[in-house]
Amino acid sequence: MALKRINKELTDLGRDPPSSCSAGPVGEDLFHWQATIMGPSDSPYAGGVFFLAIHFPTDYPFKPPKVNFTTRIYHPNINSNGSICLDILRDQWSPALTISKVLLSICSMLTDPNPDDPLVPEIAHVYKTARAQYESTAREWTRKYAI
């Protein structure tokens, strides 16, 4: 079941790739993908290329994939291990969702962080109280790690 669904998503991604994102298997292992997200132009991540690892569980799509950033990023919802705090990767997962939709949600989170459900409270605090400082640090990290 999982393999059939993963293959279908791979075909769909090739046919209709989401803008500014790409994803595909690492080598022959269809359960382990690498994805790239281009930093959205209307965000402090503009110009950056961010890599993510995607691991599909054997009971996919009934359980969500594990997705994490392998490129360092300064963001209130992404920690230093690359873990992502995003509801659709946890309790709001639905088998109707696809990797394409997950990547688009992550892209939108880069533009609009959710400081009220942070994985890194310190960054969320800076985001809420000193937005210019947050954007400056995020741009600096993008230059340092994603370009």
UniProtKB/Swiss-Prot annotation:
InterPro entries linked: UBQ-conjugat_E2_core, UBQ-conjugating_AS, UBQ-conjugating_enzyme/RWD
Pathway membership: Protein modification; protein ubiquitination
Keyword set, alphabetical order: ATP-binding, Nucleotide-binding, Transferase, Ubl conjugation pathway
One GO molecular-function entry: ATP binding
Enzymatic reactions: S-ubiquitinyl-[E1 ubiquitin-activating enzyme]-L-cysteine + [E2 ubiquitin-conjugating enzyme]-L-cysteine = [E1 ubiquitin-activating enzyme]-L-cysteine + S-ubiquitinyl-[E2 ubiquitin-conjugating enzyme]-L-cysteine
Top-rank EC class of the record's enzyme: transferase
A single BP term in Gene Ontology: protein ubiquitination
The keyword ATP-binding belongs to this UniProt entry's keyword annotation: yes
Domain UBC core: 1-147
PROSITE patterns, per database record: UBC_1 (PS00183), UBC_2 (PS50127)
Active site, renumbered: 107 (glycyl thioester intermediate)
Its EC number(s): 2.3.2.23
SUPFAM superfamilies the UniProt entry points to: UBC-like (SSF54495)
Highest taxon listed in the record's lineage: Eukaryota
Role noted for this protein: Catalyzes the covalent attachment of ubiquitin to other proteins.
Family from the record: Belongs to the ubiquitin-conjugating enzyme family.
Designated name of the protein: Ubiquitin-conjugating enzyme E2-16 kDa
Origin species: Pyricularia oryzae (strain 70-15 / ATCC MYA-4617 / FGSC 8958) (Rice blast fungus)
